[in-house]
Swiss-Prot record:
Name the UniProt record assigns to this protein: 1D-myo-inositol 2-acetamido-2-deoxy-alpha-D-glucopyranoside deacetylase
Gene that produces this protein: mshB
Binding site for Zn(2+): H13, D16, H147
Pfam (any one): PIG-L
Gene Ontology biological-process annotations: mycothiol biosynthetic process
SUPFAM superfamilies xrefs: LmbE-like (SSF102588)
PANTHER family: 1D-MYO-INOSITOL 2-ACETAMIDO-2-DEOXY-ALPHA-D-GLUCOPYRANOSIDE DEACETYLASE (PTHR12993:SF26), N-ACETYLGLUCOSAMINYL-PHOSPHATIDYLINOSITOL DE-N-ACETYLASE-RELATED (PTHR12993)
Free-text comment on the cofactor: Binds 1 zinc ion per subunit.
Residue ranges of the TM segments: none
Cysteines engaged in disulfide bonds, as pairs: none
Keyword Glycoprotein: no
Species this chain originates from: Mycolicibacterium paratuberculosis (strain ATCC BAA-968 / K-10)
Top EC class for this record: hydrolase
Molecular function terms, GO-annotated: N-acetylglucosaminylinositol deacetylase activity; zinc ion binding
Length: 300
């Protein structure tokens, strides 16, 4: 029997997996791959959309994190993934919030003991033995402190998983990617949005709000979702109802700031470790598994 491809995605908060990599996850689960998602916090500091669940917010009942476990569970189900996997266990590290967010009763993820956090992720990597790990770039995408720390922890864990500093059998990850936004495709998708795609009160994004995109020449891979994966991404986003609203046509969504974001059917990556596979005329891989060989399934 041929070995099953295995991919591991590491994200900061519930909804990050759907916003940035949802179509990719759905694409590979539909193809039969073993896809797992690690979430590093419960997302307790998220801003709640609407009045229905407003009392769960951090400055009220402070129950949002527990509620979002259910949202993440539903979103992962839409993407074809099993139960949530929280780094260190659900609630081990608290959502750090944006800069200036006051400290709460629980230890923030950005204050986590690095060896403990890295060791927890090394254990997951050595158990799953993924062919591909996906994390964030050094800026954490748009700069959220937890995203930046996910980059630090994931980078260290990928390196440590192949060495002997933690318990378990070492596993050298063949390919390690950053999930990134590509500027040109994002801008094209924004320009393609129409008033019919937006809900009342939404605004269009400005160039000043999205300065963290990557130029084409800095992209290494793209996963173009088919209709099934794109629909799964939309459904997963809708499952995060305290954080995301999907527009009437399903072509856009918005967070609590009511800025319309196109729901992209292509997701982009930078390869930071490992050998690239075949590239297209743009110089991009079109498969994160490109260049990997899958023989007989290994015995455990």
């Amino acid at each position: 029997m041929a070995e099953t491809p295995r991919l591991l995605f590491v994200h900061a908060h519930p909804d990050d997996e759907s916003l940035g990599t949802g179509a990719t996850i759905a694409h590979y689960t539909a193809a039969g791959a073993d896809v797992r998602v690690v979430t590093c916090t419960l997302g307790e500091e998220g801003e709640v959309i609407g009045e229905r669940w407003a009392e769960l917010a951090v400055d009220r009942a402070d129950q949002l994190g527990g509620y979002r476990i259910g949202e993440l569970t539903a979103a992962l189900r839409e993407l074809g993934v099993g139960e949530p996997c929280y780094l260190g266990g659900a609630g081990r590290w608290r959502d750090s919030g944006m800069p200036g967010t006051p400290r709460r009763r629980r230890q923030r993820f950005i204050d986590a003991d690095e060896r403990e956090a890295v060791g927890a992720l090394v254990a997951i990597i050595r158990e799953q033995r993924p062919h591909v790990v996906v994390g964030y770039d050094p800026a954490g995408g748009y700069g959220h402190p937890d995203h930046v720390h996910v980059h630090t922890v994931t980078t260290a864990a990928v390196a440590a998983a192949g060495a002997g500093n933690f318990p378990g059998e070492p596993w050298a990850v063949p390919k390690f990617y950053w999930s990134v936004f590509a500027t040109r495709p994002f801008e094209a998708a924004v320009q393609a949005l129409t008033p019919e795609d937006l809900r009342p009160g939404w605004s269009m994004p400005s160039a000043e709000q999205f300065t963290f995109g990557y130029a084409d020449e800095h992209i290494d891979a793209v996963v173009a979702a088919g209709p099934h994966a794109w629909a799964a991404k939309r459904a997963a986003l809708a499952a995060h109802a305290t954080q995301v609203v999907v527009g009437p046509t399903g072509r856009a969504c918005a967070l609590s700031n009511n800025v319309a974001l196109p729901i992209l059917d292509e997701e982009h990556y930078v390869l930071v470790a490992g050998a690239a596979g075949a590239r297209d005329e743009r110089g991009w891989e079109t498969d994160l598994l490109a260049g990997l060989e899958f023989g007989a399934a290994p015995r455990r």
